[in-house]
Amino acid sequence: MVRATGSVASRSRRKRVLKQAKGFWGDRKGHFRQSRSSVMRAMAFNYMHRKDRKGDFRSLWITRLNVASRIHGLSYSRLINGLKQAGIHLNRKMLSEMAIHDPQGFAVVATQAKLALEAAVQG
């Protein structure tokens, strides 16, 4: 009976890891054992940061909205509260894009929010 070796599978596994380690520095690029641990670590960081990216973008949008709303005499929290009271359903990403690319449109939205806040205080 022929002796079955795992050479084809082993070689393809090593090639896959070394291919993923392309761009790494020193032994981490060309030596399988070093590459394997570095690739696993890189993949773990990649997974974490894919999750973090969502919150990072939300923070960016909020920062942009805070700056844009202060130009119109509102803080970020008062802008969001006013939008909710006015029944304007725009998410933070869309508002942020609007503040950058369509300042006149954002001014209209901010004015609506301000009017809704004033109406809530009076009524």
From Swiss-Prot:
SUPFAM superfamilies: Ribosomal protein L20. GO terms for biological process: ribosomal large subunit assembly; translation. Keywords: Ribonucleoprotein, Ribosomal protein, RNA-binding, rRNA-binding. One of its GO terms (molecular function) is rRNA binding. The keyword rRNA-binding applies. It holds the Pfam family Ribosomal_L20. One of its GO terms (cellular component) is ribonucleoprotein complex. NCBIfam families: rplT_bact (TIGR01032). Belongs to the bacterial ribosomal protein bL20 family. This is Large ribosomal subunit protein bL20. It comes from Chlamydia trachomatis serovar L2 (strain ATCC VR-902B / DSM 19102 / 434/Bu).
